[in-house]
Amino acid sequence: QWLTRNSEMSKFEGVVWNNVLVGCGSNVKGVEKGWPYAANTVVEKTPEEVEKPFLTVNDGKYSVFVPKVKNNTVGVSWSGDKVDGEFIDLDKFYVAKPGDSVAKINSQLNAGKNLILTPGIYSLDAPIEIKNEDTIVLGLGYATLKPTNGNECMKVADVGGVSIAGVLFDAGQVNSSTLLTVGTAGNKTSHKDNPITLCDTFYRVGGADETPGKATTCVIINSSDVIGDNFWVWRADHGKGVAWTKNTADHGVIINGDNVTTYGLMVEHFQKYQTMWNGNGGKCYMYQSELPYDIPNQSSWNASGSYGYTDYKVAGNVTSHE
């Protein structure tokens, strides 16, 4: 259950479960044998490489570097003298802190600012709304968004170039229909030339405190051409406030957009389908999942016309999926 992406190495050994190498070339020793002879999958080139934005300082001046999305890559992206991307001055960002109101954050976003979420827990009585193209949202230190009124944590309009990175979406006590929604249902606008990217995003339902979290679905992706890198989507199976009827959550991920690509999609313990993929042209490089452990009886866990739920469900009308 391991993904290595865009790395350079001479040898990889010690594989037990599924081991996936993407964009690491074809000459890595130790992974020559693939399935079904060994638990290795090697994809020589990364079809669409996205790296998360990061905070940097040059000559005492802070900025955020936003790497450019690149196609068909092998190896690390930073080996040369010049790395493709853009430096954005810190004055183009609103630097938020826990306790800031949603109204204040949204006002800054509507004015054209990007957003840095400093470490801490943000209690939200309404969703943070991303409406402008090319908006950067960068969380530091596992910045955590937690709804208080059964609202979403964040809504992203169907606009290109948005980047969400380093954010934990944590379900609140009142059930939320979703924690993150990307795009609007039914919209088929292509963003191939300027995709929305989701890097190092984490979704949690319960487990952190005695107040059980609740969410129907953690993340719904309606936009097309979205690239996701490192999703951890978890209905708690241990910790505090955990039980079948306490931290309730039907689904981890629902993907309705076309041509969505994920690298490292990990979804665990939801009470119906873990992942539902309804869009065409989807690609998933390394999937890890666990079904719920706490099912009380068969009648509590039956899909229509069958016993139990498929873990990774691709809709019947989908004609292409990898």
Positions of PLM-derived features:
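Extracellular/periplasmic carbohydrate-active domains that bind, remodel
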Residues: 1-322
